[in-house]
Amino acid sequence: MTSATSNGQEPASGGAPAPAHEPQNDTHVTDNTGEPPLKKAKLDEPFTLNGDKPPRRKGVAPIKAEYLVDINAIPVSAPEENTDDAAEAAHHEEREDDKKKKPKIRGQNTNRTFGRYQDEKGLCPSRVFAPEFSPGECRFGDKCRFEHDLRTYLKEHKREDLTTFGGVCPVWDARGKCYAGWKCRFVGSHMTERDTPDGRKELVLVEDEERKKKSPRLVPYASEEGLANTISVDDRNALSRKKIKTPRADAYSSWLDKTSKQLEKTLHGRRQNDGGVVEFTKEEREEQRANYTEPPFLPSEKRRLYFGPETPTLAPLTTQGNLPFRRLCVELGAQFVYSEMAMSMPLIQGTKSEWALLRSHETELTPPTISPSDKIVQGYDNSKDMKFGAQIAANKPWQALKATEVLSKFTPNLRVIDLNCGCPIDLLFREGAGSALLEHHSKLEKILRGMNAVSEEIPISVKIRLGVRDNAPNAQKLVERLVLGGHESHLLGLGPCGTAAITLHGRSRQQRYTKQADWGYIAETAALIKNLNKRKDELTDTIYEPDERMLPNGGKVYFLGNGDCFSHQDYDDHINNAGVDSVMIGRGALIKPWLFEEIQTGQYLDKSASERLSLVEKFAKYGLDTWGSDEYGVGITRRFLLEWLSFHRRYVPVGLLEYLPPNIQDRPPAWRGRNEMETLLASDHYKDWIKITEMFLGPAHKDFKFEPKHKSNAYETEG
C-alpha cells in the first residue's frame, strides 16, 4: 500500500496504517500491470477524467468508462437477489411453509448444506497428541471405530499435507504449539522421528519454546489458545440437565409477572387522555406505589461505558460476524464488536453451537483506543473496558433474564449484553422476538429492566429499527420510554429501565434493505435523546428518585446510528450532522473491512489486489487458529471464508470510480479490474471464490459443498 494521497501529501503523523504483507504462500500473486499500487484518494477530491464527466446515475456504481465490459460479449447470469438480510440471522432463517410450491431459482437459500470434510477414518482421541509408542489408553479397546496405528492413519486415512504458508502450520508458527496434533494438515512442519533405546524410530510432535515466548497472553484470563468467554463441557451439560439454577432471574421474573397483573387490574377501566395514557393524581400515584411490592433486589452497579467519534463499531452479523472476521476488523481499527446473535433458549439449554458464538479472541478483550475528553462519563475506566459484547434474542422476559444470568455467570468478560430488537427474519418475528418487540413497548421495557437487574456489572444495551411498517416509525416513542421509563414504571416509582446504549437502524422491518437508511430520522432521534438526557433530572419524580444503580453511565444513554455507512465521509457526516455518539457498521465492513482504517486515517484507501489478498490470507490463518488446522478446521475455515468473499466481491476499487463517495446501495455494471487478480476478486461465481480459498487452504475436500446465500448462484459445489 502506498502512503501518499492523490496530491502527493503524506498522511498525518501516526495515522498511516501499517503496510500489508504479501501472501506467504507458494502461490505468488502479482499485479499483471507491473505498476505500483494506486494512490489513495484524498478526502475532498473526487476522481476526474479529462473532459466532461457523465452525470451520476442513481443506483448504479459510477465506474470509469475504460473499465466497463460489454455485457453482450459475456454470458448473462441470473440477476442477483438482495442477500443483505442474510447477515441479520442466517442460521435462524424462515423455513418454507408450503412444501408443494414449485421451487424458484431466486431469493435466499435456507437450510443450506455444506457437505462433509473429515478424514476417511479418524485417529483415536487417545493418540492425537501422544508419541507413537506412548499412546493414551482407549476406553473402547478393540471396539473403537477410530484408527489406533499412527503410521497407518498418516499414510492411508489422512490427506497429504498442505503446501500453503510455506508448508508451515500457521498455528504452530504463531504459538509454538499446534492444537490439532497429528490431525493437522501441516503436521510435517511440527513432527520428527527420533531413535528409541531399543533401536526403533518413533514419531513425535514438536513444540517450539521460543515461539511460545513470543506469544504472550494479552489479557490474563485468556486461554493458552488466546480465547476467552468459553464454557466448559461440564457446565454445558449441567445447563442441559437443568442443574444450573438462576435464582436472580427466577425471582425477578416472578416479581414482573405479579406486578404486571396488579397493574393491569389497576389500569382496567380507567379513563385515558388524548395520548392514550391513564392519568392519576399525585395522591393516587402515592397510594398505588404504596400498594406494590418492591423489586426483590436492585441492579448491581455497572461498568461505565463510552462511545465516541473515535470508536467505530462493527455490527452483530450472523454467520459473517464470526471470530476470525471480528479479529480482522479489530486489527483494522474496529473499536467495538459484537458476537453473532445468540438465541436465549439454546443458551439456557446449554446448546454447544449457541455457546460457541460467545467465544472471543484476546485481541477483542483489550481496551478500546479513545481520546480523553469531557464527553467521557465520570467513573469510566478505560483499562477495565473491552471491545467485545454479546447479542441475544428472546421473545419472553423470563428467557432473556435467564440467558443474561447464565451469560454473566459463565462469560463475565463482556462489554455489554445487547438485546436484538431489529432482526427482520420471519421466523423470529412470528415467535415474537427480534423486530416483533418494536410493537410491544411495555414488554420490551420489562425485558430490559429485568436484564439490567440480573447482569451483575455488565451493562445492557438494545438495537432497534425505525418500526415494523413503512411510513409508521415508532422508534422515537420507544426511545423516550427506554430513556425515561414508561408510564407504568413512573406509576410504580421505578424510573428508567437501565439501558446504557441504544442503536437505531434507519430502516423499518418491512423495508428491509430495499431503500436507503433514513438518517434524517436517526438525526431527529439523536437530538431527542440528548434533550432527554439533559432534562432527565427535571422529568424525574424527585420524591421517588430511582436508585443510582438503575441509571447506567450516571444517567447518560449513548446513541448509535446504523445503516449504509460505506466511507469515512459517511461516518464523519453521521457524527457531525446526525449527532450520534458513534456509528455501527455492518455491510460496509463486510464489503471492505478496511473501512475502519479509512475512518482512522480520514482518507480513501485504494487497496491493491495483492493487499486485499493479504487480508484473505489473514482470515485463513485466523480461521485455522479458531477452528483448528485439521481436516474439519480447514473445511470450516473455507466455508466461512467463502461466506465473506460472497460479500467482499461487491467491492469496486475507488480508483475505478468517477465519483466519490461510493454508495453501498449502488450496483455496478459489468466491469474488469486493473489486473487479473482484481477481476477475480470481483467475480460473482462461486467457483472463483473457491479458487481464491485454495490459494491458502489447498484443494477442497472431495465431499465439500458450498451453497451461496442467493439461489441465482446455487449450484452443488465440489472442490
Swiss-Prot record:
Active-site residue numbers: 423 (proton donor)
Record key words, sorted: Cytoplasm, Flavoprotein, FMN, Metal-binding, mRNA processing, NAD, NADP, Nucleus, Oxidoreductase, Repeat, tRNA processing, Zinc, Zinc-finger
Bias kind Basic and acidic residues: ranges: 88-100
Any Pfam family: Dus
Keyword Ligase: no
Chain segments carrying region Disordered: 1-117
Names of the cofactor(s): FMN
Gene3D superfamilies noted in UniProt: Aldolase class I, Zinc finger, CCCH-type
Amino acids binding FMN: 316-318, 391, 463, 505, 562-564, 586-587
Compartments it resides in: Cytoplasm; Nucleus
A single GO molecular function term of this UniProt record: mRNA dihydrouridine synthase activity
One annotated GO biological process: mRNA processing
GO cellular component: cytoplasm; nuclear periphery
PROSITE patterns listed in its UniProt record: UPF0034, ZF_C3H1
Zn finger spans (C3H1-type): 118-151, 168-193
The keyword Cell wall biogenesis/degradation appears for this protein: no
Compositionally biased tracts (Polar residues): 1-10
EC number: 1.3.1.89, 1.3.1.-
Function according to Swiss-Prot or TrEMBL: Catalyzes the synthesis of dihydrouridine, a modified base found in the D-loop of most tRNAs. Specifically modifies U47 in cytoplasmic tRNAs. Catalyzes the synthesis of dihydrouridine in some mRNAs, thereby affecting their translation.
Family affiliation: Belongs to the Dus family. Dus3 subfamily.
Name the UniProt record assigns to this protein: tRNA-dihydrouridine(47) synthase [NAD(P)(+)]
Source organism per UniProt: Aspergillus terreus (strain NIH 2624 / FGSC A1156)
Lineage: Eukaryota, Fungi, Dikarya, Ascomycota, Pezizomycotina
